[in-house]
C-alpha cells in the first residue's frame, strides 16, 4: 500500500495494543515460514505453525486453537486473515475489545460484520437478527453465500446484512467444543496431534496427521451449524485485498483509469 510495510506487518501493528507479541500466532504454509520470520522478527519462532499441506480454514484454525489451549486453557482468541486493509485502527481496536469482552463471559462465537458501502458480489454476507440488550452485538440469523448483483442490492437496502470479514472471536473452550461437536473426526486428529505439542516429536506428528484432515472451511464446519453465533457490525475502513481488483477500488485513478503505488 505504499507505506513500507507488508499486510501481515500491518495486521500485527493494529493488534499490538490488544495483545503482547508472545500471544500472536501465525498459521501458514511450510514454504512461507522463513518469510514470516523475516517479516516478524519479534514473533517467537514456536508461534509460527507450519501447515505441511493446505486443508482449508477449519483444520488451520483447529491446529492453532488446540495448540494455544494446551498452554493457555483460558485463552480468548481473535482469528483474522492477514490480507485485509483497515483504515481506522482506533475504531478497529474498540470493536475488538467489545467482542473480546463478550466472548470472555459467554460461551459464544462473535464474527465481525462489515457495514456494506456498496452492493458487493465478491463477499459473503451475514444476516443479523435481534440485538443483544446493552451491547452492539446481534444474534446471527443466517450466513449468505456471495450474491448476484440484484441480491446484493437488496441486502444493502435491507440494512441488516453485513459483509463477512472472516474475523472470528471466541474463547478457546467454545471453539474446541464446537469443533468436537460438529466435526468430531477433525477433533480426534487434533487430540492425537496435541499429545506431541511442545515436544521434539511435534513436527513429525503434524507432518503425518495434518494432511489426513478433511479439507473444509470453518464456515461450513462450525459457523453455519452452531447456535450461539453473534455478529458485531462495524465500520473501520475494511477491505479484503485478496485480489488486484479489490485493491484497485481503494486507490486513486488517473484519467486513463490506472492506479499506481509508488514504493521508494
Kindly give the residue locations of the regions a language model identified.
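A residue-level structural signature of the nucleotidyltransferase/glycosyltransferase Rossmann-like core
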Residues: 25, 77, 160, 167-168, ...
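Conserved beta-strand scaffold positions in the cores of enzyme catalytic domains, especially
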Residues: 48, 109-111, 231
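Residue-level signal for inorganic ion chemistry
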Residues: 8, 64, 83, 126, ...
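Conserved core of the sugar-phosphate nucleotidyltransferase
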Residues: 89-210
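A conserved hydrophobic position in a structured secondary element of the catalytic/binding core
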Residues: 28, 80, 147, 170, ...
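Left-handed beta-helix
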Residues: 172-264
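Conserved N-terminal catalytic core of the sugar/cofactor nucleotidyltransferase
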Residues: 2-81, 87-97
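Conserved beta-strand segments of alpha/beta enzyme cores
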Residues: 47, 139, 228-230
Amino acid at each position: 500500500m505504499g507505506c513500507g510495510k507488508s499486510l501481515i506487518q500491518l495486521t500485527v501493528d493494529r493488534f499490538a495494543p490488544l495483545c503482547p507479541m508472545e500471544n500472536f500466532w501465525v498459521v501458514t504454509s511450510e514454504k512461507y515460514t522463513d518469510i514470516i520470520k523475516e517479516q516478524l522478527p519479534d514473533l517467537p519462532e514456536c508461534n509460527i505453525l507450519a501447515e505441511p499441506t493446505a486443508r482449508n480454514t477449519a483444520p488451520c484454525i483447529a491446529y492453532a486453537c488446540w495448540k494455544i489451549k494446551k498452554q493457555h486453557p483460558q485463552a480468548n482468541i481473535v482469528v483474522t486473515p492477514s490480507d485485509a486493509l483497515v483504515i481506522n485502527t482506533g475504531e478497529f481496536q474498540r470493536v475488538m475489545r467489545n467482542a473480546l469482552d463478550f466472548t470472555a463471559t459467554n460461551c459464544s462465537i462473535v464474527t465481525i460484520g462489515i457495514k456494506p458501502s456498496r452492493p458487493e458480489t465478491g463477499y459473503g454476507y451475514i444476516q443479523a437478527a435481534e440485538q443483544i440488550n446493552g451491547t452492539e452485538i446481534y444474534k446471527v440469523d443466517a450466513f449468505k453465500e456471495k450474491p448476484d448483483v440484484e441480491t446484493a442490492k437488496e441486502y444493502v437496502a435491507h440494512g441488516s446484512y453485513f459483509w463477512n470479514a472472516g474475523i472470528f472471536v471466541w474463547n478457546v473452550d467454545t471453539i474446541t467444543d464446537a469443533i468436537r461437536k460438529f466435526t468430531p473426526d477433525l477433533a480426534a486428529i487434533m487430540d492425537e496431534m496435541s499429545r506431541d505439542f511442545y515436544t521434539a516429536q511435534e513436527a513429525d506428528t503434524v507432518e503425518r496427521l495434518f494432511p489426513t484432515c478433511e479439507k473444509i472451511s470453518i464456515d461450513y464446519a462450525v459457523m453455519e451449524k452452531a447456535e450461539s453465533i453473534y455478529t458485531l457490525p462495524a465500520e473501520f475502513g475494511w477491505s479484503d485485498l485478496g485480489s488486484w481488483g479489490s485493491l484497485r477500488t481503494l486507490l486513486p485513478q488517473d484519467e486513463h483509469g490506472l492506479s499506481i503505488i509508488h514504493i521508494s
